[in-house]
A protein has these predicted regions:
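N-terminal glycine-rich FAD/FM-binding segment characteristic of electron-transfer flavoproteins
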Residues: 1-249
């Protein structure tokens, strides 16, 4: 079996975001890009599955839809342990576009397991994995916190309200993973970093697919208003603030 892990290139959470072009795009100047944390955990679990030879996993490939600026993030994934990588040479316009590109690669390369992080830390869309399964007409399982193989079939644990659910689906399938899929992300060793330099990154031009969404405007959240504390023994002050300042009564 072959595993494909979808990875995103996202701004580090300490980055101060600025907008450009009339607040319709993000100013990428000075941004520190990192591997999306959810995808890093997904990759870690994929490598753990491959390490257990009883699972019959022949290879773990990572795929990214984006420009060449994502190369360092792709190389990090290779250093962590992925066997090879695929980069679709296009800007990731929206989830529909990204999913359509990945689905086309899966059709051609015949991957058995497609793993996605439950969301990216920049847009928090949680849409790509489900869309990939719909494009391909294969099962998808969301909120996966555990995955293993028994007799060649996947057995997945997913979080539900009030407990956990154990499900199994036929191969091929999409697993949309979340917290718990791996204890912690695998760290790239020096040997892995050196080997990553020579691992293949296959460059693919995008297939024709138009995004379904258009960004109208970005804006930062409003600053939090100051909080005023009123002594419990002074209800008159509370009433005055509600009437004359907050104007809610």
């Amino acid at each position: 079996m072959k595993i494909l892990v979808c990875i995103s290139n996202v701004p580090d959470t300490t980055t101060k975001i600025k907008f450009a072009e009339g607040n319709t795009s993000i100013d990428t100047t000075g941004i520190q890009w990192v591997l999306n944390p959810w995808d890093e955990l997904s990759l870690t679990r994929a490598l753990e599955l491959k390490d257990d030879t009883a699972n019959g996993i022949k290879s773990v490939t990572v795929i990214h839809v984006g420009p060449a600026t994502a190369e360092p993030t792709i190389r990090k994934a290779l250093a962590i342990g992925a066997d090879d990588a695929i980069r679709v040479n296009a800007n990731s316009s929206d989830a529909w576009f990204v999913a359509s590109q990945i689905a086309e690669v899966v059709r051609k390369e015949q991957f058995d397991v497609i793993m996605c992080g439950i969301e990216s830390s920049d847009y928090n869309g949680s849409a790509v994995g489900g869309m990939i399964s719909e494009f391909l007409g294969i099962p998808s399982v969301s909120a996966v916190s555990g995955i293993k193989f028994e007799n060649g079939l996947p057995v997945m644990t997913r979080e539900i309200d009030g407990g956990k659910e154990v499900v199994s689906v036929p191969v091929p399938f999409v697993a949309i993973v979340q917290k718990g899929i791996a204890k912690e992300p695998r760290i790239a060793a020096m040997r892995g970093i050196m080997m990553a330099r020579s691992k293949p990154v296959k460059l693919i031009e995008p297939v024709q697919s138009e995004p379904l969404t258009q960004i109208v405007e970005f804006e930062k959240p409003a600053q939090r208003a100051a909080c005023k504390f009123v002594d419990a023994e002074n209800p008159a002050q509370l009433l005055d603030l509600l009437q004359n300042e907050a104007k809610v009564i």
